[in-house]
């Protein structure tokens, strides 16, 4: 998934 600003916040990215 695309992170909301974090990198490993939701296991997503920093997009």
UniProtKB/Swiss-Prot annotation:
Cleaved by the protease thrombin to yield monomers which, together with fibrinogen beta (FGB) and fibrinogen gamma (FGG), polymerize to form an insoluble fibrin matrix. Fibrin has a major function in hemostasis as one of the primary components of blood clots. In addition, functions during the early stages of wound repair to stabilize the lesion and guide cell migration during re-epithelialization. Was originally thought to be essential for platelet aggregation, based on in vitro studies using anticoagulated blood. A long coiled coil structure formed by 3 polypeptide chains connects the central nodule to the C-terminal domains (distal nodules). The long C-terminal ends of the alpha chains fold back, contributing a fourth strand to the coiled coil structure. Keywords: Adaptive immunity, Blood coagulation, Coiled coil, Disulfide bond, Hemostasis, Immunity, Innate immunity, Secreted. Conversion of fibrinogen to fibrin is triggered by thrombin, which cleaves fibrinopeptides A and B from alpha and beta chains, and thus exposes the N-terminal polymerization sites responsible for the formation of the soft clot. The soft clot is converted into the hard clot by factor XIIIA which catalyzes the epsilon-(gamma-glutamyl)lysine cross-linking between gamma chains (stronger) and between alpha chains (weaker) of different monomers. Forms F13A-mediated cross-links between a glutamine and the epsilon-amino group of a lysine residue, forming fibronectin-fibrinogen heteropolymers. This is Fibrinogen alpha chain. It is found in: Secreted. One of its GO terms (cellular component) is extracellular region. The keyword Membrane does not apply. It comes from Syncerus caffer (African buffalo). Heterohexamer; disulfide linked. Contains 2 sets of 3 non-identical chains (alpha, beta and gamma). The 2 heterotrimers are in head to head conformation with the N-termini in a small central domain. Signal peptide: none annotated. GO terms for biological process: adaptive immune response; blood coagulation; innate immune response. The gene is FGA. Transmembrane segments: none annotated.
């Amino acid at each position: 998934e695309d992170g909301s600003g974090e990198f490993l916040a939701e296991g997503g990215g920093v997009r």
